[in-house]
Amino acid sequence: MQVFELTRQLIDIESVTPNEREIGDHLWRLLSELAPRFGGTAERMAVEKDRDNILVHFGNPVVTLSTHMDTVPPFFPSREDETCIWGRGACDTKGIIASMIVAAEQLLENGIRNVGLLFVVGEERNSAGAHIAAQTPRGSKYIINGEPTDNKLALGSKGALRYEIVAKGRMAHSAYPELGESAIEKLLDALERIRRLPLPTDSILGKSTLNIGTIQGGRAPNVIPDSAMAEIFIRVVGDVTALRGAIEQAASPEAEAKEVLFIPAVHLGSLDGFETTVVAFTTDIPAFGNAWGQPFLIGPGSIHVAHTSEEHILKSQLIEAVEIYKRLVRILLQ
């Protein structure tokens, strides 16, 4: 298979979470054709209705190459120029899927076995596919998780801690504000206290960061608002036990902090001869746990263009990624 052609082929299949059926079917066809050529076994791993992980392994999968097949919205099709391939999922992670498949095919052609490919659904929302895969391990000792790291081996990734901050008030005519209670003012006070909280730091992963992502509330300009809500997202490092308590305390008494998501930060191993980096985004690695073996995180593309209208991937990085994945597999099989 040719990595540029396969990358564009995959980009042109819309797979915004949770609409992975078509790309799953396409990968199933590709891997079902690859498997018998080299004595492999292809499997569909049901996650939800019309949503399957796709797995192929050749012998016992000591090393598994894995990434996700879903993307964020909105879909836009592929195009290319001399240096780049553009389109939704180009770097996150259709180009990575293509690089992994091509690398695996070339390894197999050279007699390498005990390798697997695992492509999962739902990473962009809740890692549903990785959670299901973690319940049905296949004995893999190492999992190479693909995300856009500019082909550098990540030493770790920050976690995620998300809250809804909810405030309640009492409606009144805005001409007589003393007769009501403004939920928005309560929310703003709570958010200001949360913004001032010290956040955990880590010697490798750096500082935690906080984003107030959405604010909702109020009914009309001439009505004292009776409800307001904000969503905050913290890219966390280190132990978050104290931070959780501090957020709940800072929100009260005017508001309530409701935790809706937690993904822990992870530290990852390094290998001699690979450039390294640290990433602030979350991945499927915490959802896999250790079910598919020791994790490594590396892939072509820049996270800085992922999720944007300018998403693209360098052709040179796709070619480099094929060689990097082949080299990693050979090292880990030793």
Where are these regions (language model features)?
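Metal-dependent amide/peptide-bond hydrolase catalytic core
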Residues: 15, 148, 155, 161-334
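Phosphate-handling active-site elements
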Residues: 81-83, 103-118, 194-203, 315-316, ...
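Glycine/serine-rich anion-binding loops at beta->alpha junctions
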Residues: 73-74, 84-99, 173, 298
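Short, conserved micro-motifs enriched in small and acidic residues
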Residues: 87-98, 124, 181-184, 312-315, ...
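Acidic/His- and Gly-rich active-site-bordering loop/insert found
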Residues: 1-90, 112
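Acidic/histidine-rich catalytic neighborhood of metal-dependent amide-processing enzymes
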Residues: 98-162, 202-203
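Short glycine-aspartate micro-motif
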Residues: 55, 64, 85, 141-145, ...
